[in-house]
Design a protein with these regions (language model features):
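A glycine- and Lys/Arg-enriched "phosphate-lid" helix/loop adjacent to the NTP-binding pocket
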Residues: 103-168
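Phosphate-binding beta-loop-alpha motif at adenosine-nucleotide cofactor sites
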Residues: 129-130, 134-135, 154-157, 175-190
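Hydrophobic positions on the alpha1 helix immediately C-terminal to the Walker A/P-loop
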Residues: 20
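Post-Walker A helix-loop "phosphate-sensing" segment adjacent to the P-loop in P-loop NTPases
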Residues: 26-36
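P-loop (Walker A) phosphate-binding loop of NTP-binding proteins
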Residues: 12
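Conserved lysine of the Walker
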Residues: 17
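Hydrophobic anchor at the beta1->P-loop junction of P-loop NTPases
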Residues: 9
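ATP-dependent small-molecule kinase phosphotransfer cores
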Residues: 40-114
Length: 218
């Protein structure tokens, strides 16, 4: 490829997405792949202002405010696309923790089709592989509750809302043909699925051992 392979991992809260991303990174690096790990939130220089707007939206839910949040996020992704993604080594694999697919879970009044169009109009880079990480909502809710930071969400506060956002996200995965990764078993199982798909996109014939790394590149 003449540019890095760009892979996004998205999903509702508590699905083990960040842990999975770390495990995928480890396995790919064990197979001598150059991996760049990014986080949308940490790469966004405007996140403080956006989160202030998200907090306002949480207190006063309305479509206009939510659309403003969507616009700010799309503008930030355009900035990341132009100023961060383009600076990575051409022979690398970029794994990013959240990108525009996450809006399918967290936006409540704006149809995702409109959000997707907005991001495309902003020239946000389209991932070469979208990975949607999901679990049964009861499992992810319990996982989130057991974390030190809890659910850690501003938009989603109630179990019923979490169930609804999980259902919306899974529907978006189906509608757009993204990779669905059910992370209800071991992290090794989910890691093997994701790494195997990345190798498939790269056109590599690789035997994957999620514990030992990638072996046998053809």
């Amino acid at each position: 490829m003449n540019r890095p392979l760009f892979v996004s991992l998205d999903g509702p809260k508590g699905t083990g997405k960040t842990t999975l991303l770390e495990a995928v990174t480890q396995v790919l690096r064990a197979g001598n792949q150059k991996v760049i790990r990014l986080c949308e939130r940490k790469s966004d220089p405007f996140r403080g202002e956006t989160m202030a707007l998200v907090n306002t939206l949480a207190r006063n839910p309305c479509r206009d405010l939510e659309w403003a949040v969507c616009q700010r996020l799309a503008d930030s992704r355009r900035w990341i696309s132009q100023n961060v993604l383009t600076k990575q080594p051409l022979d690398s694999i970029i794994l990013i923790d959240r990108w525009y697919p996450s809006d399918a879970a967290f936006r409540q009044t704006i149809p995702f089709a409109e959000i997707l169009q907005l991001n495309m109009e902003r020239d946000v880079r389209v991932p070469d592989l979208h990975v949607g990480v999901v679990t049964d909502p009861d499992i992810s809710w319990a996982r989130a509750a057991n974390r030190s930071r809890g659910l850690g969400g501003t938009v989603i506060q109630k179990h019923a809302e979490h169930v609804a956002c999980t259902e919306m996200f899974e529907q978006a995965v189906k509608d757009h043909g993204w990779m669905l990764c059910r992370n209800e078993g071991t992290v090794e199982e989910a890691t093997m699925l994701v790494v195997s798909r990345i190798h498939e996109v790269l056109g590599l014939n690789v035997e994957v051992d999620a514990r030992l790394g990638a072996q046998g590149i053809a």
